[in-house]
Amino acid sequence: MRNWLKSLPINLKNQVLSLDGKRLRGVSNNEHITHLVELFATESRLVIAQEKVPDKKGERKALPSLLKSIDVTGAIISMDAHYTYKPELSQVLEAGADYIVGIKGNQGRLHAEIENYFTQAHAISYDSEEFECYTEADKGHGRLETRSVCVSCDLGWLGERESWGFGALIEVRSQREIKGKTSKEVRYYGSSRKGTAKEFARWIRDHWLVENGLHYVLDVVFREDDARANTGYAAENLSLFRRMAMNVIKAFDPKRGFEDARRSAAFEPAYLGGLLSKLFGARC
């Protein structure tokens, strides 16, 4: 799959690559766990790298291999707080990419300093060319969500900014209204890249496309969690084939839904042959 992906005219520069893990629940139990870590190109909607790890705790160890498997120069790799450690962030920068990473309690002091900074900035209505806010709203299916994204490139107060490689800090304040009930959440991020508040709003939002664009399709269309094959490398190999099928459909018939494409491939030999020819380079 890696060699085939390299042959595609994909431009990863400035594209958000969502790094996320997925446990194959159908073949996982207390004695046998199949856990995968993947890089998902959110604009191209392609799985561009995949590694098997023992469990979620082992996800960080897969990062060097993932970064070496494909050229990520100029891309933006988005990661959850599980990766908020200096060695991992340095690996991303050394690969020629930028990062956006969540900051939570696993970096307690850093999280507290950032939270305090943004709290004070709002309290005094901080006005600076290096501090900007942007608000957006989504409405649908009885839900209204409003997000306020504030970005600061004024990091002179942060003593370890250089060792972290931060170029910007981001605060996202979300308010959701569902069936008359309101919930609020505040999240913080660090990034090696500088950008506008509107750009960071899109980049952070794009990270979650891995849920609908990859995990949902695998679970609902390909029924991955219903698969039971776990002998040897069966689970890992079958997971790779599912992702290859997704990539072929998305790369060469992007306007067609996955369910429709699978049905056509099953009942229309010409359509199946066309897809396979794109994958193997010869008419089937």
Regions found by a protein language model. Give the residues of each.
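Short amphipathic alpha-helical "interface-anchor" segments enriched in bulky aromatics
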Residues: G190, K194-A229
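Generic secondary-structure signature for well-ordered alpha-helical cores
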Residues: K6, K68, A97, T119, ...
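An anionic, glycine-rich sequence signature occurring as long contiguous blocks
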Residues: K104-R205
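Conserved, well-structured functional cores that handle cations and Mg-NTP chemistry
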Residues: M1-M79, T84-P87, K255-G257
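Conserved PLP-enzyme active-site core in the AAT-like
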Residues: S69-V72, L89-A95, Y117
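A residue-level signal for conserved active-site and pocket-lining positions in enzyme catalytic cores
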Residues: D20, Y99, Y189, E211, ...
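A short alpha/beta connector and helix-capping loop motif
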Residues: T34-H35, K86-K104
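A short, flexible helix-boundary coil/loop motif
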Residues: V217-C284
